[in-house]
Design a protein with these regions (language model features):
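Acidic-and-aromatic substrate-binding clefts and catalytic sites of carbohydrate-active enzymes
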Residues: 12, 91-97
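C-terminal helical cap(s) of enzyme catalytic domains, especially alpha/beta-barrels
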Residues: 95-108
Length: 108
């Protein structure tokens, strides 16, 4: 039997005000920032960076995206679980550094 761990490589953007539905976006940063993107907050249980920002639509948004840091954390989990095969689930929004992180893990 083979077990393969699928790693996320995409982003989600949710308006937390205004009653707007969340949407999956295909990039590593939000496209509708009003001002400067604040520093991320690390969500240890999700192993991903989260940003709260004010959008150009006038709503407050919660945005999170997979990146090299989140990939590294999930690869460490794969090691802990003894999983030696991985795959990525992505929609053209991959942080290029994720590939470097995965390649380093694969060489171990």
């Amino acid at each position: 039997d083979k077990l393969v761990m699928a790693l996320p490589a995409y982003a989600n953007d949710y308006a937390v005000t205004g009653g707007i539905k969340g949407r999956q976006i295909y990039q590593s940063v939000p496209d509708s920032i009003n001002g400067i993107l604040p520093s991320p907050t690390w969500l240890c249980y999700e192993k991903v960076n989260m940003y709260l920002y004010d959008g150009t639509d006038g709503n407050r948004h919660l945005f999170y995206a997979s990146d090299a840091r989140s990939t590294e954390a999930l690869l460490e989990l794969a090691d802990e679980l003894g999983i030696s095969q991985i795959g990525f689930w992505h929609f053209n929004s991959v942080d290029p550094q994720m590939w470097d992180t995965a390649a380093k893990w694969q060489k171990k």
